[in-house]
Amino acid sequence: MASGRRAPRTGLLELRAGAGSGAGGERWQRAVLSLEEDALTVSPADGEPGPEPGAQREPEPAQLNGAAEPGAASPPLPEALLLQPRRVTVRKADAGGLGISIKGGRENKMPILISKIFKGLAADQTEALFVGDAILSVNGEDLSSATHDEAVQVLKKTGKEVVLEVKYMKEVSPYFKNSASGTSVGWDSPPASPLQRQPSSPGPPPRDLRDAKHMSLKMAYVSRRCTPTDPETRYLEICSADGRDTLFLRAKDEASAKSWAAAIQAQVNTLTPRVKDELQALLSATSTAGSQDIKRIGWLTEQLPSGGTAPTLALLTEKELLLYSCLPQTREALSRPARTAPLITTRLVHSGPSKGSVPYDAELSFALRTGTRHGVDTHLFSVESPQELAAWTRQLVDGCHRAAEGVQEVSTACTWNGRACSLSVHIDNGFTLWAAEPGAARAVLLRQPFEKLQMSSDDGASLLFLDFGGAEGEIQLDLHSCPKTMVFIIHSFLSAKVTRLGLLA
């Protein structure tokens, strides 16, 4: 009787095994890839076994700027640099940023670490920074207890000259040298994500492929844009959902790489409904999230301010966009996303070709801006297909409108003409300004519908300007904090009202 399971797809590809000491600067091992319904199996190709059991592995020296030059061995890091902090001045060009990627942060119980240095950009040109360097401070601002997002914001706001205080972390550098260059973190590493490991226990370095190894396809990350400088685009990167395992593969040509990526992604997609159901059960049991429904889940590739990229798992609910570095598998992990963007204060500002310099297919990118009490957060993401781009952009816009219709009204304290007031903004009733002096009756000072609003603006600090025309003209409200949250909510209400009238598709 037939089992009902289709035969796995198999093929011969190359697996990146790590940095080599020869002229090539890196080693590739032929491997047989077998795609099954829920897993990917990688086996040594016939005639190309891994090293003999018990064979000595040459120690891998620290690499200058995280990459070996073709035709030369990796230069070892001077021993003196391992013992003391260093100050490195980076001078940024007019375009390109610092040219580094970072990992770690307080939420991962690790310092902020340089995980990749991009060839030819500002950090690389110093010849004084290394993959595995911990960033202790930026222009004197301490990062020793910073979260990943806080560090990104500090680096993003730097000027043309940046002074980095760094210290090389020998214990964790093997993970970042390998993951930054697209190599595997090692099949035999202990069952914990390298980013969540203590620096004192980094685990073994990556090993050659000796036996068949298996990677679960459950919510795996699949990308073809991990080597932007490759003119043939024949590389694949597959990461497990928990971030423990990474496969960096090379196909014979672009068509083969595209075919394999599509086939692997199709299998991942068949498993996604099961993952969605599991997360929905966890979300329903998480008191902070209430009973929100999950509208969409999937991997995005985020463009970082440093110029690198990072896989980001996005979970879209009725009210929020939740972003994670790996698949949350417990209620605690689900309740602690790396970032949260309330949909009512989030705006899709770009979809399609990017105007900036993006090291991957900018045709499949989109940008989001979120108004917060600290200002505006902007994030650029890309996906793997036009279908994904259309689905994400449509659901994000619809989600913003649903959130606006659900909230209906928001209020905030403010000052108008020296008087303490309360501003209420209602999706149907418009703007109402109430007197809010202690002991005074709650009196309406001003009421205007949305239809009368001719222009709105803010100073980015605390002032909101609303122009309703007529005798009243423009009014100035002091919200006592950054007005961006209220500005974005007003935009969401307006957009939802226009869509409700059928003026937008």
UniProtKB/Swiss-Prot annotation:
SUPFAM superfamilies: PDZ domain-like, PH domain-like
Location (main, coarse): membrane
Any one Gene Ontology molecular-function term assigned to this protein's record: transmembrane transporter binding
Name recorded for this polypeptide: Alpha-1-syntrophin
Intrachain S-S bonds: none
PDZ domain sequence ranges: 87-170
Entry similarity comment: Belongs to the syntrophin family.
InterPro entries named among the record's database cross-references: PDZ, PDZ_sf, PH-like_dom_sf, PH_domain, PHsplit_syntrophin, Syntrophin, Syntrophin_4th
A single BP term in Gene Ontology: ventricular cardiac muscle cell action potential
Compartment(s) where it occurs, according to its Swiss-Prot or TrEMBL record: Cell membrane, Sarcolemma; Cell junction; Cytoplasm, Cytoskeleton
Source species: Bos taurus (Bovine)
Modified-residue entries (Phosphoserine), positions: S101, S184, S189, S193, S200
Keyword Ribonucleoprotein: no
